[in-house]
């Protein structure tokens, strides 16, 4: 299974709010420049009101939680899965299945800031994470051009059946806190849309259930 966390709320602080007191104070506290730190609503909320589509931005924690679910899964450990993160700003982060993402959130933030600065981590040797400019459509085409989407308006099927459907598929989950996909074609052109119920779930909750279903289908549980 290939998991794609799409339109994720992960980005560096944009230039238009570099001079905001909340951003300046956070950057100074961490000994970094304003443009070199991750946008985080929990720290930069007062500054984010001027940003376009601000409700969908500044949530690195969503990416962190989903990564923890996938990277520590049996799928990843057995080499049966891989995860990609597509950001709202059209960057793609590829994650090696062997990568052990920091469980501490602050350490994760520092790692991703380094990734944005250097393009890969670690800087030398075999990369565990790499980042590049790439749109979502290009990524999905690169991965075979066929995908399924987890979406509350999709078809609800038993978890046993879901596991069989997603085990060998590219699975797209939204990495944003509110709303729906900006790229409507993701839903319209998907091979299938599946739901875990009528209630919208956090990305990590969806990832957890999808991963567990795939693990069961693979005979790992």
UniProtKB/Swiss-Prot annotation:
The record marks 61 as: Stabilizes Arg-59. One of its GO terms (biological process) is rRNA base methylation. It catalyses: a pseudouridine in rRNA + S-adenosyl-L-methionine = an N(1)-methylpseudouridine in rRNA + S-adenosyl-L-homocysteine + H(+). Disulfide bonds: none annotated. Belongs to the class IV-like SAM-binding methyltransferase superfamily. RNA methyltransferase NEP1 family. The record marks 59, 100, 103, 107 as: Interaction with substrate rRNA. InterPro entries: Alpha/beta_knot_MTases, Rbsml_bgen_MeTrfase_EMG1/NEP1, Ribosome_NEP1_arc, tRNA_m1G_MTases_N. SUPFAM superfamilies: alpha/beta knot. Keywords: Methyltransferase, Ribosome biogenesis, RNA-binding, rRNA processing, rRNA-binding, S-adenosyl-L-methionine, Transferase. It comes from Pyrobaculum arsenaticum (strain DSM 13514 / JCM 11321 / PZ6). It comes from the Archaea. CDD domains: Nep1-like (cd18088). Homodimer. Its EC number is 2.1.1.-. S-adenosyl-L-methionine binds at residues 174, 179, 196-201. Methyltransferase involved in ribosomal biogenesis. Specifically catalyzes the N1-methylation of the pseudouridine corresponding to position 914 in M.jannaschii 16S rRNA. GO terms for molecular function: rRNA (pseudouridine) methyltransferase activity; rRNA binding. Pfam families: EMG1 (PF03587). This is Ribosomal RNA small subunit methyltransferase Nep1.
């Amino acid at each position: 299974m290939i998991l794609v966390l799409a339109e994720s709320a992960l980005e560096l602080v944009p230039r238009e709010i570099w001079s905001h007191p909340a951003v300046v104070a956070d950057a100074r506290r961490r000994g970094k420049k304003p443009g070199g730190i991750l946008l985080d609503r929990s720290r930069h909320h007062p500054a984010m009101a001027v940003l376009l589509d601000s409700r969908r931005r500044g949530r690195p924690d969503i990416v962190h939680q989903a990564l923890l679910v996938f990277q520590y899964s049996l799928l990843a450990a057995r080499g049966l899965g891989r995860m990609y993160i597509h950001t709202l700003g059209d960057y793609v982060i590829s994650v090696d299945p062997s990568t052990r993402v920091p469980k501490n959130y602050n350490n994760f933030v520092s790692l991703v800031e380094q990734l944005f600065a250097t393009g890969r981590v670690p800087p030398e040797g075999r990369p565990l994470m790499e980042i590049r400019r790439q749109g979502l459509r290009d990524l999905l085409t690169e991965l075979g051009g066929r995908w399924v989407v987890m979406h509350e308006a999709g078809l609800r099927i038993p978890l046993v059946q879901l596991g069989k459907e997603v085990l060998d598929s590219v699975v797209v989950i939204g990495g944003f806190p509110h709303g729906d996909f900006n790229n409507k074609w993701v839903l319209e052109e998907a091979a299938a849309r599946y739901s875990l119920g009528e209630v919208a779930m956090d990305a990590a909750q969806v990832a957890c259930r999808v991963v567990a279903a795939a693990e069961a289908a693979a005979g790992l549980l």
